[in-house]
């Protein structure tokens, strides 16, 4: 038991507390209808709008069975829409709505606030090294 390290536990704590703080910051802007996991979907679509569900699942690391009800909810509250693919009518592409595009600036601002909070007291070199370590951990987990 003495050889166990606390990395996984610490990552989970950072994730949980970070989500709570992020949601609290969004609430200051009256954004209460979107949770942090849904924010991950929106962030992916802000980077590349019109993704098929399979690709969206991949970039968000969410299973299709988890993603589908989240997309249903975001569509229901008017933040995205599903559109038939012109090349394959069986495939649905996910697009942001105009209503959602207005949120992007707020999310960006809150994300910058979170970045400042996360990396307070770190040098650029330390941040780069830390993120490299996280990428390696993520890669290890994806191999499993």
Functional labels for PLM-detected ranges:
Residues 1-3, 124-144:
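C-terminal regulatory/oligomerization modules of transcriptional regulators
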Residues 1-32:
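N-terminal leader segment of winged-helix/HTH proteins
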Residues 3, 7, 37-38, 99, ...:
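N-terminal positioning helix adjacent to the helix-turn-helix/winged-helix DNA-binding module
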Residues 15, 43-47, 108:
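Short, locally clustered residues in the helix-turn-helix/winged-helix DNA-binding domain
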Residues 21-66:
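N-terminal helix-turn-helix DNA-binding core of bacterial DNA-binding proteins
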Residues 53, 71-72:
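Short, hydrophobic-biased segments on the C-terminal half of alpha helices
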Residues 72-132:
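Charged, amphipathic alpha-helical coiled-coil/dimerization segments
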């Amino acid at each position: 038991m003495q050889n166990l390290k606390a990395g996984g536990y610490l990552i989970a704590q950072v994730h949980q507390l970070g989500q709570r703080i992020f949601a609290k910051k969004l609430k200051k802007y009256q954004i209460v209808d979107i949770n942090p996991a849904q924010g991950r979907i929106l962030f992916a679509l802000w980077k590349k709008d019109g993704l098929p569900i399979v690709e969206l699942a991949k970039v968000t690391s969410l299973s299709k069975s988890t993603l589908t009800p989240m997309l249903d909810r975001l569509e229901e509250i008017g933040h995205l829409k599903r559109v038939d693919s012109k090349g394959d009518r069986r495939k649905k592409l996910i697009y942001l709505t105009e209503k959602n595009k207005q949120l992007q600036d707020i999310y960006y601002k809150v994300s910058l606030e979170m970045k400042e909070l996360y990396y307070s007291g770190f040098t650029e070199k330390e941040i780069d090294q830390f993120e490299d370590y996280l990428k390696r951990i993520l890669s290890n987990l994806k191999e499993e």
